[in-house]
Amino acid sequence: MKTRQNKDSMSMRSGRKKEAPGPREELRSRGRASPGGVSTSSSDGKAEKSRQTAKKARVEETSTPKANKQGRSEEISESESEETSAPKKTKTEELPRPQSPSDLDSLDGRSINDDGSSDPRDIDQDNRSTSPSIYSPGSVENDSDSSSGLSQGPARPYHPPPLFPPSPPPPDSIPRQPESGFEPHPSVPPTGYHAPMEPPTSRLFQGPPPGAPPPHPQLYPGSAGGGVLSGPPMGPKGGAAASSVGPPSGGKQHPPPTTPIPISSSGASGAPPAKPPNTPVGAGNLPSAPPPATFPHVTPNLPPPPALRPLNNASASPPGMGAQPIPGHLPSPHAMGQGMSGLPPGPEKGPTLAPSPHPLPPASSSAPGPPMRYPYSSCSSSSVAASSSSSAATSQYPASQTLPSYPHSFPPPTSMSVSNQPPKYTQPSLPSQAVWSQGPPPPPPPYGRLLPNNNTHPGPFPPTGGQSTAHPPAPAHHHHQQQQQPQPQPQPQQHHHGNSGPPPPGAYPHPLESSNSHHAHPYNMSPSLGSLRPYPPGPAHLPPSHGQVSYSQAGPNGPPVSSSSNSSGSSSQAAYSCSHPSSSQGPQGASYPFPPVPPITTSSATLSTVIATVASSPAGYKTASPPGPPQYSKRAPSPGSYKTATPPGYKPGSPPSFRTGTPPGYRGTSPPAGPGTFKPGSPTVGPGPLPPAGPSSLSSLPPPPAAPTTGPPLTATQIKQEPAEEYETPESPVPPARSPSPPPKVVDVPSHASQSARFNKHLDRGFNSCARSDLYFVPLEGSKLAKKRADLVEKVRREAEQRAREEKEREREREREKEREREKERELERSVKLAQEGRAPVECPSLGPVPHRPPFEPGSAVATVPPYLGPDTPALRTLSEYARPHVMSPGNRNHPFYVPLGAVDPGLLGYNVPALYSSDPAAREREREARERDLRDRLKPGFEVKPSELEPLHGVPGPGLDPFPRHGGLALQPGPPGLHPFPFHPSLGPLERERLALAAGPALRPDMSYAERLAAERQHAERVAALGNDPLARLQMLNVTPHHHQHSHIHSHLHLHQQDAIHAASASVHPLIDPLASGSHLTRIPYPAGTLPNPLLPHPLHENEVLRHQLFAAPYRDLPASLSAPMSAAHQLQAMHAQSAELQRLALEQQQWLHAHHPLHSVPLPAQEDYYSHLKKESDKPL
């Protein structure tokens, strides 16, 4: 049992927190109040929540609670696990399917809790989120549900939550914070805590209160001074909020270990922040605002808890906090870690969102989930632990079922489970928890399962956890054995975390859970929790770990509690002592890389721890009380005792303890019990500590809480009430039974006032009033909490405004963009008109880049050449004009492109040379002249200035001429630039132009007017056309096509042979086409112009003439033939693209044609066969 107890403690802490509605609430409260766990969680959650909020806002709400839960650490996990505890699930899942009023309440509470918790939990979850996924099978679900439900729940719970949650959060926060702060102080506070605990008890969360004022204050102060509520709540919630705010949290969060989680949260929360809003919302939206402050509190507090911080660190590390944040989901640090590992981020995040719920679940899933659950389970820990664990595990989903269980199934399981759970449950009492509790009961089997899981998990877990695996199992065992040795736990936790990472992804949530759980279980719950918790929640876990551990380790526990609070690890470690917090932290941190997790845990745990501590302490509960003189001690003892003595007694004693704890703690009535025991202890555990306390208490206490079951319920109630810090005590009577609570009555009476807030009891659930949602708190004016809330609200408002502004700006930008586009269109039209009239204004450029044309797809080098490709290059634009008949054609019928446009494929329109030429020559020439002039002017900068650049492009036969230059093969293959065939090309240097002109003949002379040149080209084309009849000429012309095409592919292949052949052909065969004079295609054929220094090519041989021949006409028309030079690069580019496919087709066609006319080739073109076959092959290949 001890182990279990520990586990329970942890469970409680982890799961507990989450589990019991109370816990959850408490968690939430605690989450809120507990800076650490919750805070962290919360914060985390918050951050996460924020994040999630955004995403999961709702879910997150749920999640928030989750976060809280997470804070609960994995309370939710556990919860999830436990979701088992129906409540959780209920909350989450159940939320959707609220189990029972309680559940609902729980939900509510939980919601709130979730709110707060969510954050933490979320965070955890986030951490877990990692796991989110991770766990959340049940957990996730649960978590999700939780988150989601929670969201809902929180949403609804919100109503109360607002006040309450915030309150609770503060309380939670505070406690947590206290925890956090506590931790540092814990020792001291313990005592005070104790006393305060009681109030805290009531506050449970109020661990701080336990810290009593000091802690509280500290908490609060630490938390946020008054922040306790504020701060801590904030922490948790705030944390969440902060986290949410998150980011603020982040920073803030960071500071606080608790916050760390938040930070994680922050990180995790990054999302959470969004979530936090939720959380805050749920948790107390304000809290959101406050959270920052809270966080600050938290920070103060948090920092204190090194564990947390370590968590933080670790957290910061990915593992816990870091992980958490990082994973954000790491939430469950390890869970997250694991989850994170696997899921980590995604889930984390997603989980965060979705995971958020999931995260929780993941947390849940992760060990956390289980832990949480387990924690619940663990809480039940021994029995419950098993049960719970199982439950958790089982429950994870079972939680759901458990939820059903929740009904009070849990009570039965409660026996032990319940015992544990009850507390949990009791805490959960809030329905959620109850559910959980119940859940756990059902889970008990799972527990077995869990246990098995434990083992199994360990295996899986380990496997999953990898580290965890080894560790967990070992740790599990370790924990188990070591149960009291939280350290192992931490380690396991760590491991878990580490491992968890892995496990989380998949099953490990369960396994994790399991592992955790089982860790926890084996551990004692503490471990479970620790493991679980630590690992899942990391913070929660950790804290649970330590908290539990703390608890678990009674001795150390006491301090650990502190420590626990402080650092689960600490606790865990033996650091139990406050010192441990550090130590723990260190160890835990160290050990636990997850200490980071612990941060989460811490948050949770811290909270938990604190609470646990408180709880423990108080709960120490009572039992511990004696043992744990220091609260922690007490707690520790309690836990320790607890574990040790108490556990047994615990479980059994639990009731008493529970009672003690519960009543006292729970009730807050008895200071120890009240705070320590339950409220603090149980409640603490349950509520604030819930996770811690819950775990601790629950775990520890919980077992005692078996009794606390009832107590826990109280605790739960208290926990819920806890938010009402002091209120708690008054709030919940000490109902022995945790079974379905009576339907809540709406009372709306002030229940308790803390330094920073006034708690109003919204619903009276009779003895079972533990749902955080039952209470809502209104921050007192002037309190830090109020300030934080205001700040948060302000911040949110500012952010919203900022977003709105940005949106408007974007809208305006879009409008401007559209306007610009319209302007461009107008300019384009104008340009076209002007261009047609010969004075293409500069706007012409816009023509170039006409949207339709992919202007020049990089079909070829040419196409890719910057000058051409740059849509903005003037040359391009000009070319585009040419290339885009549709652009130019519109107004002018005479436009060369005009006629062809309608008939031909747009891509080729420009190339319908025959059509072009058929139009009125005079008009065409005039236009061309004008255009050419314009183009030249415009091109000068683009092309003439960079002739060298272009030449390569156009070195080719004339790119203008060559349809293929587009191919690039040719283009690339340009002959000596000097030979650039395209006399017209602006890029040609004057000399080249000169040379070309001379070579090509008058038609090409640069000095010729464009019109003249066109005429010359036309003549040339005609000449060629005559040749067109000559198959050889045609062939050669065609050759160019295939060749070019091939060119692009294999430059050298036939090229050389063909070149020779063609050269011969062009030279000898077709004297007609004197290579130089006529830019016959022959010459041009396949070789880059460079090859044939025929300026022929350059001269626009008008293929259009050639095209006129049937053979070539179709293909050519299709292919933008090498059209006239005037067509220019744009055309070429265009053609090029269009051509590629065409070319291949053409080549094949020609090939056949060639075969038919082979004899015609006077020139031996042996390569031709080759070439064609090659070509054919090529054409089969994609271009």
Curated annotation (Swiss-Prot):
Motif interval(s): Nuclear localization signal: 16-32
PTM summary: Phosphorylated in vitro by MAPK8/JNK1 on Ser-732.
Pfam families: Atrophin-1 (PF03154)
Induction or repression: Induced after vascular injury and by growth factors. Decreased levels with INF-gamma.
Cross-link (Glycyl lysine isopeptide (Lys-Gly) (interchain with G-Cter in SUMO2)): K1176
GO molecular function, one term: transcription corepressor activity
Region of interest called Disordered, as start-end residue ranges on this chain: 1-603, 617-760, 780-855, 921-940
One GO BP: neuron apoptotic process
Cytoplasm recorded as keyword: yes
Quaternary structure annotation from Swiss-Prot or TrEMBL: Interacts with NR2E1; the interaction represses the transcriptional activity of NR2E1. Interact (via its N-terminus) with FAT1 (via a C-terminal domain). Interacts with BAIAP2, WWP1, WWP2, WWP3 and RERE. Interacts (via its N-terminus) with MTG8; the interaction enhances transcriptional repression of MTG8. Interacts with PQBP1.
Protein's UniProt name: Atrophin-1
Species lineage: Eukaryota, Metazoa, Chordata, Craniata, Vertebrata
Gene: Atn1
